[in-house]
């Protein structure tokens, strides 16, 4: 009767084997459990081999096996619930890690888009700077050409003024020589008149009335010639004064033109210097932006492009500095050549020389007036004829 009871017990073994597959679940969930809590390793290592050992031990009776199983069922259930909780925690952590991963990916995409926008804005900024530098170069070139043309016109005007001054100086010398010659003629005629008057006084006692009449006529002619020569001398002096005033006015206008050109060149030089400083500041800002972009972005192609743009702007800056230096040196040369102080000193020297000549002529006239030599009537008539011829030539 006991044997049939043992069979149902043997038949119950497959029914009570349902808790045994739990260790298989534990083996499948071993990685997640290992990541979440190290206690699962101890549970799986300590409990599962015992169950397997109890299962494999065929020598133990079925009643003991059933008792052991009924005693281990709560433990297995507790371990299963613990493992389920750990699995739930692992799933939650996995979900959190996936959410963090998605957030990190979204942030990376946003950063990538922002970097692309920054690159596009930097490219547009560099293109705008390049266009501005090209336009500035064109304006500078046109302004330099205009200044060169104006400088050429000013130099031609200055050279023409200098030529006019030279012509006036030569005319001044001619008029002074004519003035000295006319003064000499006047003095000689006055001397001749005095001689004739003395001869007339001496010839009162003579009986020749014809000679007296001739001498009177000669005296009248000499007086007329003296008045004509005096008027010619006065006209020469007035012409000399007018030409001197005109030459001084022209020199003053040339000096004012030179000062105006000099001030205009200095003003333009200051403007170009300010423009160059502004361009240098822009280049420094571009260099700083380039360094920041190099730190943020490691793309070598954009870096080379920016460096080439920077070198082009720097080369254009050097060209403008060279043009400014050339313009400055040309301006200094023109100002040195157009120095009117030398011309004023020359005119003063000529004036002083004319005064010296005039004083020398006056002293010579005084010496001639003090001379008491007499000439014959024939020589006086010849001298009068010569002075008449000279006077006619002067009138012609």
From Swiss-Prot:
Residues 67-124, 158-366 form a coiled coil. One of its GO terms (biological process) is cortical microtubule organization. The keyword ATP-binding does not apply. Residues 1-49, 99-122 are annotated as: Disordered. GO terms for cellular component: cytoplasm; microtubule; nucleus; plasma membrane. InterPro entries: ICR (IPR029688). The keyword Hydrolase does not apply. ROP effector binding specifically activated ROPs and linking them to the microtubule cytoskeleton. Involved in ROP-regulated polar growth. Involved in local disassembly of cortical microtubules when associated with ARAC10 and KIN13A and conversely also mediates the elimination of ARAC10 from the plasma membrane by the cortical microtubules. Accumulates at the plus end of shrinking microtubules. Targets KIN13A to microtubules. Belongs to the ICR family. PANTHER family: INTERACTOR OF CONSTITUTIVE ACTIVE ROPS 2, CHLOROPLASTIC-RELATED, INTERACTOR OF CONSTITUTIVE ACTIVE ROPS 5. The N-terminal part (1-122) is necessary and sufficient for homooligomerization and for binding to microtubules while the C-terminal domain is anchored to the plasma membrane. This is Interactor of constitutive active ROPs 5. It comes from Arabidopsis thaliana (Mouse-ear cress).
